[in-house]
Swiss-Prot record:
This is Ice nucleation protein. The keyword Repeat applies. It is found in: Cell outer membrane. It comes from Pseudomonas syringae pv. syringae. Keywords: Cell outer membrane, Ice nucleation, Membrane, Repeat.
Amino acid sequence: MNLDKALVLRTCANNMADHCGLIWPASGTVESRYWQSTRRHENGLVGLLWGAGTSAFLSVHADARWIVCEVAVADIISLEEPGMVKFPRAEVVHVGDRISASHFISARQADPASTSTSTLTPMPTAIPTPMPAVASVTLPVAEQARHEVFDVASVSAAAAPVNTLPVTTPQNVQTATYGSTLSGDNHSRLIAGYGSNETAGNHSDLIAGYGSTGTAGSDSWLVAGYGSTQTAGGDSALTAGYGSTQTAREGSNLTAGYGSTGTAGSDSSLIAGYGSTQTSGGDSSLTAGYGSTQTAQEGSNLTAGYGSTGTAGSDSSLIAGYGSTQTSGGDSSLTAGYGSTQTAQEGSNLTAGYGSTGTAGVDSSLIAGYGSTQTSGSDSALTAGYGSTQTAQEGSNLTAGYGSTGTAGSDSSLIAGYGSTQTSGSDSSLTAGYGSTQTAQEGSILTAGYGSTGTAGVDSSLIAGYGSTQTSGSDSALTAGYGSTQTAQEGSNLTAGYGSTGTAGADSSLIAGYGSTQTSGSESSLTAGYGSTQTAREGSTLTAGYGSTGTAGADSSLIAGYGSTQTSGSESSLTAGYGSTQTAQQGSVLTSGYGSTQTAGAASNLTTGYGSTGTAGHESFIIAGYGSTQTAGHKSILTAGYGSTQTARDGSDLIAGYGSTGTAGSGSSLIAGYGSTQTASYRSMLTAGYGSTQTAREHSDLVTGYGSTSTAGSNSSLIAGYGSTQTAGFKSILTAGYGSTQTAQERTSLVAGYGSTSTAGYSSSLIAGYGSTQTAGYESTLTAGYGSTQTAQENSSLTTGYGSTSTAGYSSSLIAGYGSTQTAGYESTLTAGYGSTQTAQERSDLVTGYGSTSTAGYASSLIAGYGSTQTAGYESTLTAGYGSTQTAQENSSLTTGYGSTSTAGFASSLISGYGSTQTAGYKSTLTAGYGSTQTAEYGSSLTAGYGSTATAGQDSSLIAGYGSSLTSGIRSFLTAGYGSTLIAGLRSVLIAGYGSSLTSGVRSTLTAGYGSNQIASYGSSLIAGHESIQVAGNKSMLIAGKGSSQTAGFRSTLIAGAGSVQLAGDRSRLIAGADSNQTAGDRSKLLAGNNSYLTAGDRSKLTGGHDCTLMAGDQSRLTAGKNSVLTAGARSKLIGSEGSTLSAGEDSILIFRLWDGKRYRQLVARTGENGVEADIPYYVNEDDDIVDKPDEDDDWIEVK
């Protein structure tokens, strides 16, 4: 027989027309004008190869024409239905009925001489059927109905011979070239290239290229390229490229590219790219890219990109990008990007970006960005940004930004920004900004900004700004601004601005502005402005402005302005303006203006202006103007003009003229002329002319001219001209001109001109001009001009101009201009201008300008300008400008600008600008700009811009921009832009842009752009499984399984399985299985199976099976099977079978198709003026007459 040609059987109508309208010739050549080399029925000629296979496409009409054509084997493409083939051209060699065509083909099979012979040796023949390229994506299709098998051999054997030739029934079909060996049992088909060996059991199908070896049990299907080796048990299907090796037990399905090796147990499924190696136990599913290696025990599911290695125990699930290595015990779930390495014991869950390494104990959860390394004991949870390293014992929870290193003992919690290093004992909690180092023993809590170093003993709490170093014993609390160094023994509390150094004994409290140095014994309290140095023994209290030096014995109290030097014995109290020097024995009280020198015996009280020298005996009171020298005994009052020198004891009253020097005791009244220097004790009243210097104790009233210097005690009122310097005690009111310096104790009110320096005690109110420096005690209110420096204790309110530095205690409110630095205690509110640095303890509220750095404690609210760095404690709210870095503990809310990095703890809400990196704890809400990276735990809600990567835990809601990659736990809701990749757990809802790739559990609702599975916009194509819901815009194409619901706009195509509901606009095409409901607009085409309901507008075409209901508008065409109801408008054509009811408008045609046992015949009626009445239902009665369907109690009317 000729090996180059094959015979194909098909049927046409009695006019030789096929279903596409092509008229076949009675003999000669026929060719398709619209040929396409695909495995679909359209765009080509189709038929039954050698007349054996499915009967679904052969006409059952009695007048059908049965055509036999001769086709070149090289042109044949096999279709999915048994025996069906497709070809572009053919030669018609026979036209007749079913029996004659069957005899014709059987005779040609039996007679080798009936066709032209080839030069090859005759062999048992089968027709090679070239296999087209298989698409890399397999679309789900509706369940196909089963049809009877047609075989020309059985037809020829059953029919009476008519000029018969001998008829034979082929049991095997074999085709091979030279050097091949083929051996097959009954009903097998073997096709091989040269040099191949094929052995098959019953009902098997083998196809192989040259040099291949195929061995299969019964009911198997093998396809391989050249040089391949395939061995399969019964009921298996193997497909491989050239040079591959496949071995499978019964019931397995293997697909591999060229050069691959696949070994599978029973009932397994393996898919691999070229050059891959796959080995699996029973009931497993393996999918790998080219060059991968996968090994799995029974019940496992592995998916990997090209070049990957996966090893899994029983019942495990592994997903990896290309070049990854995964090893897991039983019941584990591993997900990794390309180039990653993951190793896990049983019951673990690992998720990592590309290039990561993850090692986990039993029942652990690891999430990491690309390039990270994670190692954990059992029952641990680790989350890390890209390039991080995390090591944890059992029961720990670690979260870190990219490039970080975390090491934790059992039951610890670590949170760090990118590039940080954290080491903790058991039961500890560490939070750090990027680039920080934290080391803590068990039970400690550490919070630090970026670039900081923290070392803590047992049960300690440390908070630091960026670049700080903190070392503490057990039970200590340390708070520092950026660049500070703090060292404390057990039970101490230290707070410092940036660049400060604090050393404290046990149970001490230290507060310092930036650049200060503090050293104290146990149970001491030190407060200093920036750049100060304080040294105190146990039980002392020191307060100093910036640049001051304070040395105190036990139980002493020192207050000094900036640049002062104070030395006191035990139980002393010293107050000095900036640049002063004070030396006192035990029990003394000294008050001085800036630049003064005071020396006092025990229990003395000295008050001097700037640049003065005061010497007093026991319990003396002296007051002098600037430049004066006063010496007083007990209870003297001294009054002197400027440049004067006064010496007085308690109870004296001193008045001095211009340039005088006055020294007076307690309760004195001093009046001085222009340029005078006055020093007064308790309850004094001082009045001085222009350029004077005044010094007074508590309850004094000072009035000075322009350029004066005033020093007053508690509850004093000071007024000074331009360029004055004022120092006041408790509850004082100070007013100064431009460029003044003011120093006051608690509850004082100070007003100063431009460029002033103010120092105030507890509950003071300070107002200063541009460029001022202010230092205030507890509960103070400070207001300063541009470029000021402010230092205040707790509950203070500070307002500063541009470029200021503010340091405040507990519950303070700070407002600063552009470029400021602010440090505040517990529950503070800070507001700063552009480029500021802010450090605050818990429950603080910080607002900063562009490029700021903020560090806040527990429950704080931070707002920062563009390019800021923020570090906050537990339950904080952070808002930052473009390019910021934020680090926060649990329950925080973070908002950042473009390109930011955010790290947040449990239940946080993060919003960031374009290109941000966010890491959040459990139940967080994340929103990020274009190109962001987000990592979140269970129950989180993530929103990201274009090209983002988001990883979230269970019950999360993710929204991402164009081209994003989202990974989430079960029951999640994901929304992504164009071209995104989404992976979600069971019962998830996914919405993605055009061309996305979605992976989800069953019963999910998916909405996606063109090429994805679910809801899509205009012009999209949706493909879904059974029981799906699809909603699409105009000109869409929807494909779904049985039981689905489809809704689309006009000019759409809808395809669904049985039991579906379809709704579309005008000019749409709807196809559905049985028991379906279809509704479409005008000019639509509807096709449905039995027991369906079809509704369309005007000029539509409706086709239904048996027991259907069809309704359409005017000028429509309706066709249905038996027992159907057809209703149409005017000028329509209705075709129905037995038991159907037809009703149409005017000028319509009603056609009833009846089967008389031999052939179909038609009864036709027309509606209108010359026909039957329109809009009346008609049917065919038992006498084959068309009658209208009667209502109840009406007689039927026969239509003639």
